């Protein structure tokens, strides 16, 4: 008899069923691994699968996480180049793609990443036909559209990480100005993730007190306190971090884990994330942009309709036109 047989008396033969709360991360670069560790630290999955094309790096990352199993509550961590390891995932997070270079706009990346998605998405769909897709790769709004088109999934199951991080950055910077924790600083950034995102100044508040009611110039050029700079800093922040350390990872990883928690626990929290906005705010094309969405186990079930100023709506429509201009040229 083996040590195991001496030690353990089997009571019930377990069938090797599949995981109940499986999450897959596609792409084990800096962003993918930040997502992975953030998800593991929040105990959101009973199985985590990692996929990438670079096999040595992939196996190394898997082993490194497995060696930390004692300190985690996720019993199974697997990886592979073959998408069969992703089978029966509830949530699949796509971080793979060409990385944004210093000074490169997110939109510049697009065709390079479409070609990568043409391989990834059909493989994901084949093994997890009922999953929710969470797209993180940039330019996220266009690639969420690409994932939706290629997957054939209903729109509520294809989600872009969108402005969840932009809004978090905004609330952090607002908190720094006011000396208050970001959780108690409320403000929404909507529209395109990145350079043409739209801050909704009318909704910025602390404890229900509207900052614009206190200071009507808030967010305008006439503002002596230059609150507009806060939004400019949000837009510039990724570029600054890329310039300093070469890429962004931790904040986006935490932001994605925040979304994953809402999905896996069916929390129905409202997040500024990228969804199909055709028919909203006068948008006529199939574009994905960030608006406040009710998120849960089935994906995006509802959208909260914000009361926007005409110039805010105009900015969102302009973003939609820009994105559609790029999307209609894409080669699938």
From Swiss-Prot:
Pfam families: Ldh_1_C, Ldh_1_N. It is found in: Cytoplasm. Its EC number is 1.1.1.27. Keywords: Cytoplasm, NAD, Oxidoreductase. This is L-lactate dehydrogenase A chain. Its main location: cytoplasm. GO terms for biological process: lactate metabolic process. NAD(+) binds at residues 29-57, 99, 138. It comes from Caiman crocodilus apaporiensis. Homotetramer. The lineage of its organism: Eukaryota, Metazoa, Chordata, Craniata, Vertebrata.
């Amino acid at each position: 008899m083996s040590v195991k047989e001496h030690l353990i008396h089997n009571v019930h033969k377990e069938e090797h069923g599949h995981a109940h709360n499986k999450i897959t991360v596609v792409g084990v670069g800096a962003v993918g691994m930040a997502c992975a560790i953030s998800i593991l630290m929040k105990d959101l999955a009973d199985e985590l699968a990692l996929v990438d094309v670079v096999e040595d790096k992939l196996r190394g990352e898997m082993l490194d996480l497995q060696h930390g199993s004692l300190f985690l509550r996720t019993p199974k961590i697997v990886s592979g180049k073959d998408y069969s390891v992703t089978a029966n995932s509830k949530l699949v997070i796509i971080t793979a793609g060409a990385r944004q270079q210093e000074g490169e706009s997110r939109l510049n990346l697009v065709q390079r990443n479409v070609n990568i998605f043409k391989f990834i998405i059909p493989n994901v769909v084949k093994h997890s036909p009922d999953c929710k897709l969470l797209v993180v790769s940039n330019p996220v709004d266009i690639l969420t559209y690409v994932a939706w088109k290629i997957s054939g999934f209903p729109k509520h199951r294809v989600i872009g990480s969108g402005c969840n991080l932009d809004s978090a950055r905004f609330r952090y910077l607002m908190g720094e100005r006011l000396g208050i924790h970001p959780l108690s600083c409320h403000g929404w950034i909507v529209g395109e993730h990145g350079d043409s995102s739209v801050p909704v100044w009318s909704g910025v508040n602390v404890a229900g007190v509207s900052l614009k009611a206190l200071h009507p110039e808030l967010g305008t050029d006439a503002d002596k306190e230059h609150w507009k700079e806060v939004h400019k800093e949000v837009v510039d922040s990724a570029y600054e971090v890329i310039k300093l350390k070469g890429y962004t990872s931790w904040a986006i990883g935490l932001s994605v884990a925040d979304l994953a928690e809402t999905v896996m626990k069916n929390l129905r929290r409202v997040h500024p994330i990228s969804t199909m906005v055709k028919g909203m705010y006068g948008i006529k094309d199939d574009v994905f942009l960030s608006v406040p969405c009710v998120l849960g186990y089935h994906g995006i079930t509802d959208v909260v309709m914000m009361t926007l100023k005409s110039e805010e709506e105009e900015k969102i429509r302009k973003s939609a036109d820009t994105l559609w201009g790029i999307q209609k040229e894409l080669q699938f």
